[in-house]
Amino acid sequence: MSKLPLVLMSAALTSCATLPPSGQPASPAAPTPAPHSASTSRDPFSSTYQAAASPATLIRGATVLTGTGTRLDGTDVLILNGRIEAVGKDLHAPEGANVIDAAGRWVTPGIIDIHSHLGVYPSPGLKGLSDGNELTSPVTPNVWAEHSIWPQDPGFETALEGGVTTLEILPGSGNLIGGRSVVVKNVHATTYQAMKFPGAQQGLKMACGENPKRVYGSKGQAPSTLMGDVAGYRQAFADAQDYRRQWDKYDREQAEYQKKKDGAGSDSGDKKATPPSPPKRDLKLDTLADVLKGDIRVQMHCYRGDQMATMLDVADEFGFKIVAFHHAVEAYKVADLLASKGVCAAMWADWWGFKVEAYDGIQENIAIVDAPAGSCAMLHSDSEDGIQRLNQEAAKAMSRGVRAGLDIPPERAIRWLTINPAKALGLDDKIGAIEPGKNADVVIWNRNPFSVYALADEVFIDGTVAFDRAHPPRKPPSDFMLGQPNAEELP
């Protein structure tokens, strides 16, 4: 066989590996560009995701962890039209419903990973596929992680097998301000738009600490110190405040001009009214202005407790909110401060010590952050490996907390993977809980999900079976997962 057909067959298999489970996303309507304005957020890359049609499903007799702190034994969950219709005992199965006997098994909301780089650093880890850090400037709020996502990353499939239904894909942490993040549904697709969570706010990835000063200090430019880090954030948001004032002034002048123009036919109208000239558009400052308006949610990479406190002061100075600190190895030192400010912390169970700012980690970190009233502790992956077993990572953190004397039953720990990240994404009205009206993102586990032997038996996204361990996926696995022992090289 010639070399070219082999290459074409490989490409075809890879493409087939990511076809949607049923149907095609609706074609977007022809775009109608709106006038730019500082008062409106803009997303020209709209979601084309559409939930696949699915039959009614009744899950019977499971142990249900609702995601909001409640455990329900011997309970049924009814899924209808992609949503959770009812939760209770002895629920009636509609005609034609798929009835699942879940006695002895556990049900949870779909896992939400609030810190993932799947798609922007896909497997295999090649330079040609490494698109997560735009290391040409320390301030790059103009770049969007979604424009680097490769939907065929096999990591999405292995994450799904671990019960992950929603992910926030972020840029890397080499820059002070790394760019916009995006929330995606973990569905098979050939475009990122078909994965994009409809209506989800974007995030802004920011990073404090060692990474930016190492990247740019090694080039002999700012920042090269922690004080250079802080100066960089402050200047960026000072510029954004000025930019926003310019656009607010233009909006006022445009409204006044329109008022005069509309009255031109009357005796009081100004027939010679001149339209105002808009400021020059700046994609970097567009993003930061949207942060100042609260339209983009700040997700901040930060390890040390003292640096988290400093960044909260910077946010207060410029009037924006940091939704969550990520990695947050020393969050236990400022747990009360974070709770009082309503700021979440996304953490690892026990990853620490790999650089100076990560030295003071403790395995009770998540449990301690979870303890104060009003807290918002979360567990994240930041890894194509860890995302496959987030339930086990949470079990480690839960175990360390219990050993330290804290009361952390499964119904409390599951919040770290479900409702808390949903809140941090502004999506807790849609996902993160087993409650009537919520999207039917549901996982059926073969046992207590915090057991080392736990496996996700079935995973539902919007009521559709996205993964079924008993019935291997119909799509062919990717070339990366299979290997290519017979591949021929091109000359």
Label every model-predicted segment.
Residues 62, 423, 435-479:
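C-terminal cap of metal-dependent C-N hydrolases
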Residues 14-15:
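C-terminal motif of bacterial Sec signal peptides marking the signal peptidase cleavage site
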Residues 19-54, 484-487:
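N-terminal pre-domain segments of enzymes
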